[in-house]
A protein has these predicted regions:
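Non-heme di-metal
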Residues: 43, 71, 76-79
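Domain-length accessory/inserted modules outside core catalytic folds
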Residues: 76, 80, 84-94
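Active-site donor/metal-binding and catalytic loop motifs
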Residues: 47-67, 78-79
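A short, conserved alpha-helix in the catalytic core of glycosyltransferases
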Residues: 5-8, 12-17, 23-51
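Amphipathic alpha-helical segments in well-structured domains
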Residues: 30, 34, 68-73
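An anion-binding catalytic pocket shared by soluble metabolic enzymes
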Residues: 1-3
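Glycine-centered small-residue hotspots that permit tight backbone geometry or close packing
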Residues: 17-18, 27-28, 74, 136-143
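Non-catalytic, C-terminal membrane-associated alpha-helical segments of glycosyltransferases
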Residues: 70-71, 88-143
Length: 143
């Protein structure tokens, strides 16, 4: 779910509850809440493709990657344990698969960082962000 810039009626939150306070650091609280809302109101989440949202942030790429690492490290497994039927939809199956290790590893990360210095392409940025999240999830299993 992409939950940014969502308008929710108070009555919906009264039925589903607020953010899960067991999520202890950055990330995932909106996804977890969206799952609960979708369970109670499966046909009521809609998106408007014409809506425009501009998000200004002064975070650097490294700060954002650190946030995504923390999300993977601290919160993602709690969400999967709470909602195991969303494991595949949230991409958890890929993290420990052969394909996941082939895609998200230190070689591909370093190559991506090198290429990012040459060309500022948004796919390189997205890869690094997702890779940081995957690293966090993998490290959470090791701790």
């Amino acid at each position: 779910f992409v939950f940014s810039n969502t308008i929710i009626r108070r009555s919906i939150l009264e039925k589903t509850g607020l953010f899960d306070e067991k999520l202890i650091s950055y990330g995932g609280e909106d996804t977890e809440l969206a799952i609960r809302i979708n369970r109670v109101f499966p046909k009521n989440l809609r998106k408007c493709m014409d809506a425009v949202s501009i998000h200004y942030s002064d975070k650097t790429l490294n700060q954002y990657r650190k946030n995504m690492f923390e999300y993977g490290l601290n919160n993602f497994n709690h969400i999967i344990e709470k909602h195991p039927d969303y494991k595949k939809k949230l991409g958890a199956n890929l993290i420990y698969s052969f394909k996941g290790y082939l895609i998200f590893n230190s070689i591909s990360r370093n190559l991506c960082l090198f290429l990012l210095n040459l060309i500022r392409h948004p796919l390189l940025v997205k890869f690094l962000v997702v890779s940081s999240f995957v690293q966090g999830v993998r490290n959470s299993k090791n701790s």
